Structures are given as structure tokens and as C-alpha cells.
Amino acid sequence: MIYMVELALLETARRAEWDTWYAAHQRRLLSIPGFRASQRFEAIHTAESPFVALHEVDSPDIFTGPYYRANGGPSNTGEWQVKMGRWHRNLFGVDHTPDVPMDARLVVVEDGSSAALSNHVAVRWMEAVGLDRSVPRRGLAVMPPGTADRLVGTPGIRVLKPIGARLRSAS
């Protein structure tokens, strides 16, 4: 399943410090049984929630378990909880997160916005199955920058660059 977290950093002057904290947060999440992979992204254009993290998880049960309650979720973000806004947490019923190379883009497509994409673009559609369910359906596509960057400004489409490589749990 894909656990997708979207947010805005409200204290942008502390971006480097936040990135360091978030990298440690990813490692902590990956230590929770059932978290398999994690990768962070940033929009290359203005967006309401410019930061996105895709986490691959085994099941929705993780979010009610003791390991997640002790190490994950908004209550375990310390001082950063109030410095992050426009926060959305959705769980999608897709088995694996895409592996987005550092030289590629992740394109997030809102339901009904795919008409702007070429028929040659493979969009992986996902249905929301848990947590906030702030959107019922959303698509993901991995594309080369030259192709994806031309979509900037298209309504319902966000173009994101990786902040770091995809991380995997040790188990």
C-alpha cells in the first residue's frame, strides 16, 4: 500500500534543519514493522502542499499498532508538527511505491486531470482506502524531466523532483 504524506513547510528559513530531521524521521518509520520503503519529493513549481513523501506499507493495521503510535504520525514530529501545514495523509490501495531515480520526476495527477497527458504516459491510478481520504483517487507517473516539466501549470497536475533516493527497510 502507498502511504502518501503531503505538506508545506511553514518556516522555510529552517529548511536545511527540517531536511535533516525528516531524513531521521524516515529512518525511524522504516524501523517500524510493515514499513518497507520511503522516498521524499518537492514540487518544482508553486503548490499548496509542495512536499510529498511516499511510504510503502504492508497494511492499514500498521497505523493503529503500538510501533507506529510510538514512532510515527503527527504526534511524533516534535517541534516540527506546528511548522508543517496543509498536511494530508492518505493511504492508497496499491502494492508498491514507484522507485523514482534522482534524474526523473514524479507526476501526481488528480482524478479528472489525465486529459492533459499524452496517451504514451503510463499513469498508475490509486484509490484512497484509509487515513484522511482527502482525495478519492489519484494517479502517479514517473517521467523524464524534459517531458514532465512541460506539464508545470497544468491544472490538477503536480511535478515533483526527488529530494533523496528511495530508502528501504532492513527487514
Predicted segments with their positions:
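Macromolecular interaction modules
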Residues: 1-171
